[in-house]
Amino acid sequence: MLKLHEKSGDDTVALMADIGRRARAAARPLAIAPTAAKNAALLAMADAIVARQQDILDANAIDVSNGEEAGLSASFMDRLKLTPARIRAMADGIREIAELKDPVGDVIAAWERPNGLRIERVRTPLGVVGVIYESRPNVTADAGALCLKAGNPVILRGGSDSLNSSAAIHACLVEGLKAAGLPEDAIQLVPTTDRAAVGEMLKGLGGALDVIIPRGGKSLVGRVQSEARVPVFAHLEGICHLYIDRSADLDMAVKIAVNAKMRRTGVCGAAETLLVDRAVASTHLVPILDALRAAGCEIHADQEVLKVFFDAKPATDADWVTEYLDAIIAVKLVDGIGGAIEHIETFSSHHTEAIIAEDPKAVERFFNEIDSAILLHNASTQFADGGEFGMGAEIGIATGKMHARGPVGVEQLTSFKYRVRGSGQVRP
């Protein structure tokens, strides 16, 4: 089990520098590790998580108790809490990653030049990855497994609220590395709650870190983006929109709206704003809102909606830019697909948006004009998930445009290099 480092200041600086050196030392052997060894490690990790389920639950109980005493929100506690089912899902996710094709060494493209040079673009590991996250202990397993499959050492800095849970999961990951003969330093968990550790990671650990992936709230991601001296895959808040077009099937719209908001309110793919075409307000609006209220959702509505649906609170300007992560949704009437696109492009965090429609022209316009990482048609926003995309798992949903966008899975954790084969050519 991870030994907690309780000192701070210069001790934290030295601790993080050592973690960085060890991760960098693990980079080369991991980059050339055979697929069979990586898969063996992953399967051993999954087995260890199942075998140590009670240890993980006991550690999580400590975190949950501390969170309750601290008065953390219900949505935060939902993200923090582990159950036997969630632990099994964690293990299953690692097994799915083991079954994925190894991207390292994959030839993306190949061509021959007129002078006979044969050129290949080949996938390679990114290098040492730093993941900074908050309350979700399952990120420890997902990030560790994904980075391993892609041949990247990873330094995990979880939230202090979930440190006991993350440490118990990390012990299982190390057990898997040992079983496969891979470097134990390939997956390291920062063993301190000292916030200075994050600052050291943002500085790059003396050149040890190649990329940082933040997974958390707006303040965390904002700090990482403003202070990081290494590239960042930004996972911004999920201000996700669900638009009900005039051509939408009502039964489908009701079912998807309830699922998109209420299946799990604390996930980044939960719908936070419902937009309804004014043309079907008289037929679609109230049935959808009735279903949401029956499911326990609080409605924050614009003035037009309040005229026909009374069991709601008036929406303010802040509602359109709020990631509730709770059983609350903002609702607005818009002038058709054009009004929906205008609202989304104004207020979206460019994470995930969905349209419910039978009109193919409306769908194509939605897909073509909205610049978000994930767009869905006639499906819940809660499918915005690497596992649901067949990636086994994800580290996060990248909302930027550089390198990775959307679910960050194994393939997105690679870069590439060029291999050029000649037969004695010299440049004239």
From Swiss-Prot:
- GO molecular function terms attached to this record: glutamate-5-semialdehyde dehydrogenase activity; NADP binding
GO terms for biological process, alphabetical? L-proline biosynthetic process
**Enzyme class, broadest EC rank:** oxidoreductase
In which pathway does this enzyme or protein participate?
Amino-acid biosynthesis; L-proline biosynthesis; L-glutamate 5-semialdehyde from L-glutamate: step 2/2
What family does the database annotate? Belongs to the gamma-glutamyl phosphate reductase family.
Which NCBIfam families does the entry link to? PRK00197.1, proA
Protein name in UniProt: Gamma-glutamyl phosphate reductase
